[in-house]
Amino acid sequence: MLQVYLVRHGETQWNAERRIQGQSDSPLTAHGERQAWQVGERARTLGITHIITSDLGRTRRTAEIIAEACGCSVIADARLRELDMGVLEKRHIDSLSEEEEGWRRQLVNGTPDGRIPQGESMQELSERMHAALASCLELPAGSRPLLVSHGIALGCLVSTILGLPAYAERRLRLRNCSISRVDYQQSPWLASGWVVETAGDVSHLDAPAMDELQR
């Protein structure tokens, strides 16, 4: 049975400023770097053999820190990027007009094919995330990969594995540097294919996530 670990990147400057990142980028904060080191300490005990990351800077830096702890190299895969947020990227959430907030809400409230102008739909995101996950099945036997990606992207992946449509209301919280695990199984008793073992584990982190403090 293949086990795949899923990690959201560490806290970034724009996370702290409540700016929309999407496929734009901002660096990890000092707290985000510490979170990544704590993932690395946990990952060191898991027998990780491959670290595959979104090619955006915040995920690359998170992956590099984890890789140093695990003694692995880092492989970049653009399919693991965050949802393209189109014309709203780099904007402060509190600056959105009523119309713009309506576009953003369509991505989280169950609107079929909701998208921000010049952006990506949740279905398009789901298709590329599942393709990236499926490529793990081509790794050598005994591999245990760890994928570093983004909050909306990983939430969409895990939710669709559970059978929800890609555009379903977002009800899965994956905090910065949370760890999830999905397994690929072939069983006569349980559902064959991808199953969710854990989602959003933050027990390895020693401080509350930024979004916990902002609520």
From Swiss-Prot:
SUPFAM superfamilies in the cross-refs: Phosphoglycerate mutase-like
GO CC terms: cytoplasm
Pfam family, one: His_Phos_1
Classification via PROSITE patterns: PG_MUTASE
Keywords: Glycolysis, Isomerase
Catalytic activity: (2R)-2-phosphoglycerate = (2R)-3-phosphoglycerate
Any one Gene Ontology BP term: glycolytic process
Pathway annotation: Carbohydrate degradation; glycolysis; pyruvate from D-glyceraldehyde 3-phosphate: step 3/5
Enzyme Commission code: 5.4.2.-
Binding site for substrate: 8-15, 21-22, 58, 60, 82-85, 104-105, 151-152
Range of residues in the leader sequence: none
Site entry: Transition state stabilizer: H150
GO function terms (MF aspect): phosphatase activity; phosphoglycerate mutase activity
Enzyme kind, highest EC tier: isomerase
Residues forming the catalytic site: H9, E82
NCBIfam families: PRK03482.1
Family as reported in the entry's similarity comment: Belongs to the phosphoglycerate mutase family. GpmB subfamily.
Name used for this protein in its record: Probable phosphoglycerate mutase GpmB
Organism of this sequence: Klebsiella pneumoniae subsp. pneumoniae (strain ATCC 700721 / MGH 78578)
